């Protein structure tokens, strides 16, 4: 099968030359107890998005072959660039990227799958003002379909990144649009550090999906 060159990992350019260090405040907020944090935050999200009661949330640990990791070669290159940048960050960052590269280059890679049922999903599309955009691309903002929701896509959305030893998540969501048509979005995101590659500066975020405007696959 021919690979789509427009699907893969891409980092936004850092034209302002801002520094995005390893100690991301959102991740650090949950780093002390990531397991209880992800259980609490995802349970809240599932509860808020309940469409048919009762809603279900299932956690499952799986392992995939390294070749099955989405666009793995591109992701390894990003990790190596971040590892080089981490030399100015200190031992904590260097240890993280060394461990991340060992994992991504191992025979298998562990994934914690969180799957819910009887919910509205994370409603898109990936435009400003939608729950999907708030979850994947916004900082310091929240947006949920139900304004009475107990949680938000604010600080809590960082819990999965804190649990991930790669600071990486993949999202697959189904939702109904304004015409009641079923839609599906798939995208990956990493929160790493700002870095340089081929003479260009990049931010600390990396996105997997449609490389045009960092969009999810739909």
Name each region found by the language model.
Residues 53-74, 133, 169-212:
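Flexible phosphate/Mg2+-sensing switch loops adjacent to catalytic phosphate-binding sites
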Residues 1-110, 123-130:
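Bergerat-fold GHKL ATPase/HATPase_c domain
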Residues 15, 81, 138-141, 159, ...:
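A generic structural signal for solvent-exposed, polar alpha-helical segments
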Residues 30, 153, 207-208:
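Aromatic side chains
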Residues 87-180, 189-192:
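Flexible ATP-lid and adjacent glycine-rich G1/G2 motifs of the Bergerat
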Residues 217-218:
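Structured mid-domain segments that build the active-site/substrate or prosthetic-cofactor binding neighborhood
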